[in-house]
Design a protein with these regions (language model features):
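Secreted/periplasmic proteins that engage bacterial cell-wall peptidoglycan
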Residues: 1-106, 113-121
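Glycine-rich loops and low-complexity Gly/Arg-rich segments
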Residues: 105-109, 143-144
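Low-complexity, Gly/Ser/Thr/Pro-rich intrinsically disordered linker/tail segments
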Residues: 121-144
Length: 144
């Protein structure tokens, strides 16, 4: 996962930063279900502008996110959550290959959250080499 995060931050050109990855904890709002963060396969990438991250911004984060979604299989992406949109955020899942706008509270932090949550496959989480190759293939075709 660490390499996936490094590559994401690199190719997003300063629009995002690591707001949290590995941590053994339950899903927000649940007392019984572990978060995917506890498996080492999830990261929250923030676009919140801070003193340490002066170039972070939603426009760049969404541009990066759109490339990732268009290449989700190649990048090993299983799920992306976008906490910002009204009323209840939205989620992308690999099993439906599409976004779903939530019509009721389903993700803790929506609406208005300033980060995207990414979940990746075990194979990608465990192989820095695969991650580097995938990002290089996907982003080599896109002018920087």
């Amino acid at each position: 996962m660490d390499e996936w995060i490094r590559q994401a931050v690199k190719y997003a050109n300063g629009a995002i930063w690591n707001n949290g990855s590995w941590g053994v904890r339950n899903m927000r709002g649940s007392e019984t279900s572990l978060s995917v963060h506890a498996t080492g396969r999830a990261v929250d990438l923030s676009y919140r502008k801070t003193e340490q991250h002066p170039t972070a911004n939603r426009k760049g984060a969404v541009a990066f996110l759109n490339i990732v979604i268009a290449n989700a299989n190649a990048l090993g992406v299983e799920c992306v959550l976008d906490y910002f949109p009204q009323k209840f955020g939205r989620g992308y899942r690999c099993d439906r290959q599409a976004w779903k706008s939530y019509s009721k509270p389903e993700i803790h932090g929506a609406p208005g959250g300033d980060w995207h949550h990414y979940e990746i496959t075990p194979a990608m989480a465990d192989s820095p080499t695969l991650v580097k190759q995938a990002f290089q293939r996907v982003f080599a075709e896109i002018p920087q």
